[in-house]
Regions:
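Histidine/acidic residue-rich metal-binding segments in metalloenzymes
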Residues: 1-45, 49-66, 96-109, 127, ...
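His/Asp/Glu-enriched, well-ordered alpha-helical/loop segment
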Residues: 19, 65-173
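Transmembrane beta-barrel architecture of outer membranes
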Residues: 54, 67-69, 98-102, 107, ...
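C-terminal cap of metal-dependent C-N hydrolases
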Residues: 167-200
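Tryptophan-anchored aromatic micro-motifs
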Residues: 199-220, 227-236, 275-287, 299-301, ...
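Central antiparallel beta-sheet cores of small beta-barrel/beta-sandwich binding domains
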Residues: 210-271
Length: 332
């Protein structure tokens, strides 16, 4: 051995206390690599290919942790009907199910982290996470997969948490991170502050009741905290309203639902805007009594797509081919 040293094995033995990460190109690579790891008494961490869902139970049996990519197959496009006939049904099935890879792995309780590795459009990362939530992966599972799990894989206890003494790596957001209206204000990396969007002085969003010209109206302020929008209604009729929030003031220009001619301007200090009696100024410069009363906090409106149940994927085929069955054949 002294004459024919294997430097690869020497390096492997020298650093075997460190996590050993191996990249795979398809699901069977995982099982082959796991067999090699068993022979070497080493548990690998597997960088997935996106096909792991096809054999999630076998992935679970490796006892390994996975790093799952978020780049999925693009839709197949062809203007030639003859070319369409040449498409592999297994490829079409993979296009359908690949975005559910992490969902299937979570159902089998396979530990995994999510990665931006191989993601062509890095800016789509947050959208990918939100889409996984729609597809059935819980918010807690998603957040763990980008915080706690990566830290556990690297065996670094000072990362992936907000415990005292840990590295200050976190983001500050306006709302639930998985809401479309959510705005990222700050990103802290190793204790260094990075301002992404200026945090508003006050989040004015919510439902209010307004009295003007001896009439009562409903005022709803919604949208993003950094760029709120408003609407004013009375029963089923809508008025028009322009809203601006700046310099610790909230300014509104209002056209009431039953009056398309008159304009009213209102200026409120953000130190006292929720419950206030003051004046509105009409287009002729007259002071009109005005009262605003806070009713409840902002609640995002769910669109029809959001109200729908979690997306349900099609069945996995065994084997994963055109004539596969929906149930894995049992041994006789």
């Amino acid at each position: 051995y002294l004459e024919n040293k294997n430097t690869n094995l020497e390096a492997f033995n020298r650093y075997r206390k460190l996590p050993t990460i191996i990249e795979t190109s398809e699901k069977w690579d995982v099982l082959r690599a796991d067999a090699i790891g068993d022979e070497a008494a080493t548990q690998f961490v597997f960088v997935g290919s996106g096909h792991e869902y096809q054999r999630a139970k076998e992935m679970k049996a490796t006892n390994g942790t996975f790093i799952l990519p978020l780049e999925y197959p693009k839709p197949f496009q062809s203007q030639d009907l003859m070319n369409v006939e040449d498409l592999d049904v297994a490829d079409l099935k993979h296009w359908e199910l690949a975005p559910y890879n992490a969902v299937y792995m979570a159902k089998e309780k396979v530990p995994f982290a999510l990665t931006m590795y191989k993601l062509k459009d890095k800016k789509s990362f947050l959208d990918k996470l939100r889409d996984l939530n729609k597809k059935g992966l819980s918010k807690e599972e998603i957040l763990q997969s980008i915080t706690e799990k990566p830290a556990q894989i690297l065996q670094v206890s000072s990362l992936g948490n907000l415990n005292k003494g840990s590295m200050a790596n976190f983001i500050i957001v306006s709302d639930d991170l998985f809401m479309k209206e959510s705005v990222i204000y700050e990103n802290w990396v190793f204790g260094k502050q990075n301002i992404i969007n200026r945090m508003p002085d006050t989040d004015v969003r919510g439902d209010y009741q307004v009295q003007l010209n001896n009439q009562t109206y409903d005022l709803k302020i919604k949208g993003k905290s950094t760029k709120p929008e408003a609407e004013i209604t009375q029963n089923d009729k809508k008025g028009k309203i322009k809203l601006a929030v700046a310099d610790y003031k909230m300014a509104m220009e209002v056209k009431l639902p039953n009056d398309s001619v008159q304009n009213y301007r209102v200026m409120l200090p953000l130190t006292d805007y929720k419950n206030r009696t003051g004046i509105a100024i009409d287009k002729d410069g007259r002071n009109i009594p005005f009262t605003i009363k806070y009713v409840k906090a902002f609640e995002p409106e769910l669109k029809k797509d959001d109200k729908a149940k979690t997306d349900e994927p099609g069945k996995i085929w065994y084997p994963f081919s055109a004539f596969g069955a929906e149930q894995l054949a049992s041994q006789q």
